[in-house]
Amino acid sequence: MPRMVRCSFCGREIEPGTGIMYVKNDGSILWFCSRKCYKNYLLLRRDPRKLKWTLKYGSQTK
């Protein structure tokens, strides 16, 4: 049974068989639900807590 994973950028759940899996050189795996999340995280280096369209918007870890 495939498991649901969460997008590493926006926090939304990704259906099995969809999305982008990115493996870093250190072996950690990043999942992205769309090309939009992929570009914002890896290419533009944006913080998901500062973008209103993400589920992580406004959450501060203290």
UniProtKB/Swiss-Prot annotation:
It comes from the Archaea. GO terms for molecular function: rRNA binding; structural constituent of ribosome; zinc ion binding. One of its GO terms (biological process) is translation. The keyword RNA-binding applies. Its cofactor is Zn(2+). Binds 1 zinc ion per subunit. Zn(2+) binds at C7, C10, C33, C37. Gene3D superfamilies: Ribosomal protein L24e. GO terms for cellular component: ribonucleoprotein complex; ribosome. Keywords: Metal-binding, Ribonucleoprotein, Ribosomal protein, RNA-binding, rRNA-binding, Zinc, Zinc-finger. A zinc finger (C4-type) spans 7-37. InterPro entries: L24e/L24_sf (IPR038630), Ribosomal_eL24 (IPR056366), Ribosomal_eL24-rel_arc (IPR055345), Ribosomal_eL24-rel_N (IPR000988), Ribosomal_eL24_CS (IPR023442), TRASH_dom (IPR011017). Signal peptide: none annotated. Part of the 50S ribosomal subunit. Forms a cluster with proteins L3 and L14. Belongs to the eukaryotic ribosomal protein eL24 family. Binds to the 23S rRNA. NCBIfam families: PRK14891.1-1. PANTHER family: 60S RIBOSOMAL PROTEIN L24, RIBOSOMAL PROTEIN L24. This is Large ribosomal subunit protein eL24.
